Design a protein with these regions (language model features):
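Short, Lys/Arg-enriched N-terminal segments with co-localized hydrophobic residues
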Residues: 13, 17-31
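Accessible peptide chain termini
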Residues: 1-2, 31
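Cysteine-centered motifs
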Residues: 3, 7-8
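Active-site loop-to-helix "anion-binding N-cap" substructures in soluble metabolic enzymes
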Residues: 32-269, 273-288, 294-295, 299-309, ...
Length: 348
């Protein structure tokens, strides 16, 4: 048994240095194998509003200064779907991590400002090695990325030379370099279906996404035991309650959710595919089980619909503290100072 750091689960606590320590029970999984390891609009009609972090009196001034800095730097501003509304509204592109990185690579910008978390900025650097990549907060990490240290992955790979490693894009550049192929939540099923039939599949780092892909494909895989700490907060009970309150509203869940939540969903899909589902749905209201920042994007894309954040047992919505570390003030300062800059070793 390979023991690695497990940074996600049902119970969370804040440790020294702002790092998250999360634990969860080890039983009840239905996957082939588990390693035991120690992407300014009115809000929805219901009155729910995605929280803004910048005071209104500062918003206009900061926005003008950021746009001027963008011109001065010949920069492109990218915002992940989970960013605060004022950053989404100011960005050139809003979307999922890989889609944004691809979009930035196609521009003539000299500087990419990625409002997201660290592995996303790394992905942008991989696809645009000659561009400067800035991240508003250097400490904006990810529980999934932290759950899969490269040295522990090497140890596991050494136990089976026949492993074919499929890495979810939510991982470090070092883990990507150790993998045979990279996938997103939107194409994971196709990637697994196309994997060599004579290889033993190892899926890292999200066990819930991996388990969902196993359900879709029937292909056995060894799953790294990592989770997004946000998406495992929803429970069967909390989702059942909100569905009873809104019986006519379909539930859309991200595949990073646990099986107990996925089994209650009308659609399980990536953030970008959520937009298409909501556009096509005849329902007037939709329950969304992903990070709450996505509701701002959905409300702008489908202003005629009501979007209901799926509640957890602890709160009425669910935020990623790492995503919310980025603010308009930090965006301004990182552009003014041209740091923090994300760099990668040339050999990597």
């Amino acid at each position: 048994v390979i023991c690695v750091l497990m940074c996600c689960g049902e119970n969370t606590s804040l440790a020294k240095g702002g790092k998250l320590r999360l634990t969860r029970p080890s039983g009840g999984r239905t996957v082939s194998a588990v390693i035991d390891m120690t992407e300014i609009q009115p809000s929805a009609a219901a009155g729910f509003r995605v929280e803004r972090r910048t005071p209104p009196e500062r918003l206009d001034v900061l926005s003008r200064e950021i746009l001027q800095l963008k011109d001065d730097l010949n920069a492109v501003i990218l915002a992940h779907n989970y960013q605060v509304p004022e950053i989404q509204d100011l960005a050139d592109y809003v979307g999922d991590s890989l889609g944004l990185s691809r979009q930035a690579a196609e521009t003539d910008a000299d500087v990419i400002v990625f409002c997201g978390v660290h592995f996303m900025a790394e992905t942008a650097k991989i696809l645009s090695p000659k561009k400067t990549v800035l991240l508003p907060d250097r400490d904006a990490g990810c529980s999934l990325e932290e759950s899969c240290p490269p040295d522990k992955l090497r140890e596991l790979q050494a136990t089976n030379p026949n492993f074919y490693t499929i890495a979810y894009v939510n991982c470090s550049a070092e883990v990507k370099a150790l993998s045979d192929v990279i996938c997103t939540s939107g194409n994971a099923r196709k990637i697994v279906e196309a994997a060599p039939a004579d290889r033993d599949l190892l899926f890292v780092p999200d066990e819930n996404l991996g388990a969902w892909v196993i359900e879709q494909t029937g292909r056995p895989m060894t799953l790294w035991q990592g989770n997004c700490y946000v998406h495992v907060e929803w429970t069967h009970e909390s989702i059942t309650r909100i569905r009873r309150e809104h019986p006519d509203a379909p539930l859309v869940a991200h595949p990073e959710c646990t099986k107990a939540v996925r089994m209650l969903a009308d659609e399980v899909c990536s953030t970008e595919k959520m937009i298409n589902f909501c556009r096509d749905s005849r329902a007037k209201a939709v329950i969304i089980a992903t990070e709450v920042g996505m509701l701002h994007r959905l409300q702008k894309e489908c202003p005629e619909k009501q979007f209901i954040p799926a509640p957890t047992e602890k709160c009425a919505c669910n935020e990623c503290r790492f995503m919310k570390m980025n603010t308009l003030e930090k965006l301004h300062d990182c552009m003014a100072n041209r740091r923090p800059e994300v760099t990668l070793d040339d050999a990597l």
